[in-house]
Amino acid sequence: MSDLSAICRRSLGPALVLALLAAAPLGQAVTLFSYGADWKLWRGKKAPSRPDYWAWTKANHDDSDWEIAQTPVFYGEKVTGGTELEDMKSRYISFFLRRKFDCPDPDTITSMTLRTKVDDGFVAYINGTEVARHNVETDKPKYNTPASKAATEPLRYRSYALKNFGDVLVNGENTIAVIVLNQRRTSPDALFDARLTAVSVESVPPEVKTVDPPSGLASSLGRVSVTFSEPVSGVDAADLLA
């Protein structure tokens, strides 16, 4: 998997994401955002959007009054970094997260995976459409909805293949929104962190346009220049030897 953790703490521009997808070997996942990223945070003391309760899941929702929080968002857990919700225990049962990510050419993406660590449950939406959930049985959970059961300790990362990503992604900027729920208000802990990856397959691979010097017999050879039909990366001399 391409290691983009450092740059994925902030939103990637469409051109950079497209370049990363194109440069990755066929079938290799590229990280769209990683663990420890910055999100927008709403503490679940009241509904995050009114009068349309579900507006918070949509790309055009105004979240300018939400806090900025680095994941993991948590309380009662032994973690390094992140954002601690010191006021959550016994006061509210949920929190909400939103962040943008870029997808410059959805038609080239063959799979997407959301990998999370969560305590207790969550439901994730992309551009207003549900794409993944865990430990939440309520069809449309609200800020006062409990998780269906407590998380199993110790917490482990779980992966969710997003089967309907092709129907919800748009070309360019997209928004993922997540509600995180505890089983009860007095739960001793809560946590959420996530990473989103995509696999892209190019329909037409790059071609070799010119080779200098041209093929033939040579008594000695110090350098060969190869020109491709488009920019490539990760190619060395061994890849070009017959």
Where are these regions (language model features)?
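Aromatic-lined ligand-binding clefts that engage carbohydrates, nucleic acids, or primary amines
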Residues: 39, 66, 93, 101, ...
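Bacterial N-terminal signal peptides that target proteins for export
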Residues: 1-15
